[in-house]
Amino acid sequence: MEDIVYTTEHEWLKVGSSSITVGVTDHAQQQLGDVVYVELPDLETEFFAGDEAAVIESVKAAGEITIPFDGVVVEINETLVEQPDLLNTAPQTEGWMFRVVPKDKF
């Protein structure tokens, strides 16, 4: 069973059985405006809670995605890199950003 957790930074975390999928909320993408660029982390990058993991640039602003837990990146959404507008059109489905295996149970 997967649960979705929302952070105060307007990120969503879909908690799966072995990994957590990270993305931005519809509210966040509305505040950013048209997204033109997304920089995702490299595979196998290790993060600690509070680390900057990704960057989103739009016509209005730039924003960082931070990780609220320790973990290692196991998958990135390559389609999102090529089509950053997915963050505007489908932020909580096809616009997911990356998956992380948490160091500790989340």
Outline where the language-model segments fall.
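Acidic, low-complexity mobile loops and tails
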Residues: 1-55, 83-106
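Beta-solenoid/beta-rich acyl/carboxylate-transfer cores
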Residues: 46, 64, 70-72
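Short, charged/polar surface micro-motifs in flexible loops or helix N-caps
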Residues: 30, 72-73, 79-80
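Short, surface-exposed secondary-structure boundary micro-motifs
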Residues: 52, 58-59, 76-78
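Periplasm/extracytoplasmic soluble domains of Gram-negative envelope assemblies
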Residues: 58-61, 69
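ABC ATPase A-loop
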Residues: 5, 60, 64
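Generic hydrophobic/packing signal
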Residues: 69, 77, 102-104
